[in-house]
Design a protein with these regions (language model features):
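Conserved HGGG/HGGXW glycine-rich cap/lid loop of the alpha/beta-hydrolase fold
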Residues: 14-63, 83
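Generic structural signal for short, solvent-exposed loop/turn connectors between secondary structure elements
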Residues: 1-3, 19-21, 129-134
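N-terminal cap/lid segment of alpha/beta-hydrolase-fold proteins
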Residues: 1-12
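Conserved Rossmann-like nucleotide-binding pocket used by diverse enzymes
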Residues: 4, 26, 52, 95, ...
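Active-site donor-binding loop signature of nucleotide-sugar glycosyltransferases
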Residues: 8, 56, 123
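Short, flexible hinge/linker loops that cap or flank conserved catalytic cores
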Residues: 7-9, 17-19, 254-256
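Residue-level detector of flexible, active-site-proximal loop/helix-junction positions
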Residues: 10, 22, 125
Length: 260
């Protein structure tokens, strides 16, 4: 595996690259990096593909524009098309996880001739509707804490997370794995059910040991990545959702045509 720095859409992305064959681009979510795909990269490369796992703009070794509007689905979609062009290919297969899911779904919708197949983990494809997801969240979670609404005011979540990266990353990762979900079901009055004036880390589930799917050295790598990049870029993706709604409103109810 090697790192390449790819100039695309006016910025530079860092990508982990391995293998030869049809192009597969892997897109991580939040809070993650190319490193999330570390176990899948060699397997897919060995199966006969060129695997390119990017750091999404705002993360890791990639450029980090400041403005919220630089983090729309449309902007990041154009980044991916530039990656395909960089490798001299006409098409690519896309994999996405978490925020990478909507990114690859809509890249496929907006660029039907450039994406041959697409797969997403954890976030399904949601066609555009008559309202922004943030409007729905404001109604559903009125008077309660919801992380995506908490992330909307610039600087607030950054001020909480950046001095506490280990706690933030461990809490985010561990609270939604099997052990964390079990604890949440055992105690309904948990960190997922708190007032709208709460902070993200208030009442989070913590564990003394690591689960079997990540070790401390791997977590330290991720912490170092976020110490370098900061949290503004990752959080701006959440803030860009109203602009996404405006950009994509003409695609209401459209289905993907690629194998998915």
């Amino acid at each position: 595996m090697e790192f390449k720095f790819i100039e695309t859409n006016g910025i530079t992305l860092r990508a982990a690259v391995e293998g030869e064959g049809p192009l597969v681009i892997m897109v991580h979510g939040c809070p993650e990096s190319w490193f999330s795909w570390r176990r899948q990269i060699p397997v897919i490369a060995e199966a006969g593909y060129k695997v390119v796992a990017i750091d999404v703009r705002g993360y890791g070794g990639s450029d980090k524009p400041y403005a919220v509007e630089e983090y729309t689905i449309k902007k990041i979609s154009d980044d991916l098309i530039g990656v395909i062009d960089f490798f001299g290919e006409d098409q690519a297969i896309l994999f996405g996880h978490d925020w990478g899911g909507p990114i690859v779904w809509y890249t496929s919708l907006l660029n039907e001739d450039r994406i041959s197949a697409v797969a997403g983990l954890s976030v399904p494809y949601f066609p555009q509707r008559e309202f922004s997801p943030l409007d729905a969240f404001e109604t559903i979670y009125e008077g309660k804490f919801f992380y995506q609404l908490y992330f909307q005011e610039e600087g607030v979540a950054e001020a909480e997370f950046e001095p506490n990266l280990r706690k933030y990353l461990e809490a985010t990762y561990f609270s939604i794995d099997a052990r964390g979900m079990k604890k949440q079901f055992e105690n309904p009055l948990n960190a997922m059910d708190k007032g709208s004036d709460a902070k993200y880390l208030d009442g989070v589930i913590e564990f003394d040991d690591y689960p079997n799917w990540i070790n401390k050295d791997e977590m330290n790598y991720l912490i170092n990545e976020f110490e370098t990049s900061g949290m503004r870029g990752p959080l701006n993706r959440y803030r860009a959702q109203r602009k996404d709604f405006e950009d994509l409103k003409n695609y209401k109810d459209q289905k993907l045509k690629q194998p998915a």
